[in-house]
Amino acid sequence: MRLRAGQKIPSLLTGLLLLVACTPAPRPDLVKLYGVTRQATDQPPVILVHGILGSRIRSRGEGDELWVGRLSKILFSDYEDLALSIDPVTLDPVTPDSEAFAITDQAAGTDFYGRIIETLESAGGYRPGVPGTPARAGERRYYVFVYDWRQDNVRSAAALDAYIDHIRGDYGDPRLKVDIVAHSMGGLLTRYYLRYGSEDVLNDNRLQPNLWGRDRVRRVILLGTPNLGSVNSVRGFIEGVKVGLGRIPTEVLATMPSVYQLFPHPKGGDWIATAEGKPLDRDVFSARIWRRFGWSVYSPEVRQRIRKRFDSESEADAYLGLLTRYFERHIERARRFVWSLTVRLEETPWQLIVLGGDCELTPRTIVVEEVDGKSMVRLRPEEIASPVPGVDYETMMLEPGDGTVTKSSLLARNSLDPTVPRHEYVFFPLDFAFFICESHDQLTGNMTFQDNLLHILLSR
């Protein structure tokens, strides 16, 4: 029996589609592309600045790793030992018992920064640098700036300033300029450093930039940086951050100033709405709003959980009072921090490049849904318990991004529409931007990013 031609075509097409699907996508040969640059001997050193959760934390005494820890800890720990102690006089965090000591290159089989380091070495010809070790003539170096991601980003920016001074000493050049590659929150502390150096300007509302990075930085590449904040950070702060089978609880996160500083910028668009689709005019940096909603340290459940850690009511009362005052201080500092990054500059002597993802629908606006007298936070449309007919939750709540940072926040815009100019109070001197299809935690390992990174770093 002979088959008709029309019967053969679907089978043929199916086979061709399967063949195409199984064919690996072409990958650039980075060694061949950039190996030709090895003869250039005047390449500035590169500093890698990781993001939140991006460094390993250990106890100073016995050296036990508090973050990330062994696989069993990743799966089952609530990470209460990550909480920072609080100075009752200054209301500043203190870390007498723990320190950051290494980058989180891999954890539980997931690569975070290992592949970008490998690319810098194998294709870019860079060698790891250690501050305090003199650089040889013509040597290309990269440095990994390891900081305590729990701390105030102003404090981390001051540490970056000292780090760059050490690198200048390595090169014997007090006028040396460096390149910086910063991932996620690392981009925020880098932008603060460019504007203010080690100066803490968050004690009042004057926010006067001194352009500290003018003579110290050549190029800055921001990767997946939430330049206008992220509503993911608000949700995580309220409910805790999921790690393995557990969560880092809000009472631990509330001791970390950096987490407050990831909240959405006041000019970043509507960050909160009702289940009926009505935007709410609420100040995310107002402790009064958090108290009204019963979120974080104002949650009765959280306060009861904290009380169980103490032997007496008086001790529990004292700590809860201290934590509440600490919260109020650091949420106000966070307000000033996000504004400090967008005040206008007289000049922008460094080059600013942004790379990020724009292929995943990413939370932009959280919905507060009233359920049995409680204000429940919803980050995605499928979480709405009782959808209101006619409300387009997907359009209202989500926007293209990398799953964590929206495209508009990456570009410091309050609108996804590129024809809409930035808000007049958001100054973001961007030279150019490039987009890839990758999730937030995997951006550094993306081959297209690595290709463009080397091109940017090595171009004259």
Regions found by a protein language model. Give the residues of each.
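Serine-hydrolase catalytic core
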Residues: K278-F293, V297-Y298, V302, I306, ...
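Bacterial N-terminal signal peptides that target proteins for export
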Residues: R2-L12
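Bacterial N-terminal signal peptides
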Residues: P10-A21
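Short, aromatic- and cysteine-enriched interfacial helices/patches
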Residues: L3-R4, F76, R292-F293, R309
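C-terminal subdomain of alpha/beta-hydrolase-fold enzymes, centered on the catalytic histidine
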Residues: R307-R460
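Intrinsic-disorder-associated interaction segments
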Residues: R2, G109, V252, R282, ...
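N-terminal non-catalytic accessory region
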Residues: V20-V181, M185-P266, D270-F285, I289, ...
